[in-house]
């Protein structure tokens, strides 16, 4: 598909440690951020949240625990999704687990600020251990007007006929930061020559734009293209789910 046709973000995630090559051929990805109900926020006098303070103010405004209404559906369970969600806020505050020299930098002021904010924000989410199902359900049934979730919420939003009413915000403090991941095709070491040839042929086949298009359209909106050629294909552009979200897929 040509190296230059892949988005830089996808290439960076599969780049080798020395930066000289790649460890996989990207095929799709997904991005996590803050999804919000445009109508509810607008009716309450809020525009798209642009920073931590905006997110907190909106979450506070909509929280009415007596009536089981909450400002934001966010991960609180001990697990991967909570790690992913918190990492966005840490990165947006300039905090990271490792510095440029590979030294551990967990116990820093920036990291403590991010943790404090995440703890504060969690006051305005549903009680208990919230994970993938609880977060998605709360946003989809109107319990919360904001949710920290991946692009895999979009197929459900489409099915609910609410595509035009969803917005996407990026947690921002010192920087903009989202959590995302890329699925890549790899070829194992230790294969015999025939196996290696077959693996290379299959990787080349799936890396053709038309086949990558079919791959991401197995979950339109959820799986995101990592190759610029895919978004120019008629099948992708004319997909009913993709079309329903207008400019949102290209913004993501």
Language-model segments: what does each one mean?
Residues 153-163, 174-252:
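C-terminal lobe and pocket-closing loops
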Residues 1-6, 39-50, 145-146, 156, ...:
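Extracytoplasmic "Venus flytrap"/periplasmic binding protein-like
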Residues 84-85, 116-198:
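Extracytoplasmic/periplasmic substrate-binding proteins
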Residues 23-24, 64-78, 138, 208-219:
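Bilobed periplasmic-binding protein-like "clamshell/Venus-flytrap" ligand-binding domains
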Residues 1-6, 76-77, 93-113, 159-160, ...:
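Short, solvent-exposed loop/beta-turn-alpha elements that line the ligand-binding surface or hinge
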Residues 1-31, 56, 166-169, 235, ...:
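Hinge/lid segment of periplasmic solute-binding proteins
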Residues 58-62, 100-129:
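Glycine-centered hinge/linker elements that transmit conformational signals in sensory
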């Amino acid at each position: 598909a040509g190296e230059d046709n892949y988005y830089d973000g996808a290439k960076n995630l599969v780049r080798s440690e020395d930066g000289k090559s790649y460890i996989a051929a990207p095929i799709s990805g997904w991005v996590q951020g803050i999804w919000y109900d445009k109508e509810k926020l607008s009716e309450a006098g809020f525009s798209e949240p642009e920073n931590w303070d905006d997110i907190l103010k909106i979450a506070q405004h909509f929280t009415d625990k007596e009536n089981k209404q909450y400002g934001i559906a966010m991960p609180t369970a001990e697990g991967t999704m909570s790690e992913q969600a918190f990492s966005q806020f840490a990165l947006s505050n300039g905090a990271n687990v490792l510095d440029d020299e590979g030294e551990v930098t967990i116990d820093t002021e920036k990291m403590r600020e991010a943790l404090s904010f995440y703890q504060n924000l969690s006051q305005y989410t549903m009680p208990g251990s919230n994970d993938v199902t609880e977060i998605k359900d709360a946003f989809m049934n109107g319990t919360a007007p904001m949710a920290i979730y991946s692009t895999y919420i979009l197929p459900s939003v489409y099915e609910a006929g609410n595509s035009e009413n969803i917005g996407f915000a990026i947690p921002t403090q010192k920087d903009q930061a989202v959590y995302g991941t890329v699925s890549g095709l790899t070829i194992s070491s230790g294969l015999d020559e025939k196996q290696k040839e077959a693996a290379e042929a299959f990787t080349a086949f799936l890396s053709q734009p038309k086949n990558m298009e079919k791959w991401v359209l197995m979950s339109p909106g959820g799986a995101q293209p990592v190759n610029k050629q895919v978004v120019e294909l008629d099948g992708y552009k004319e997909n009913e789910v993709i079309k329903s979200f207008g400019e949102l897929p290209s913004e993501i």
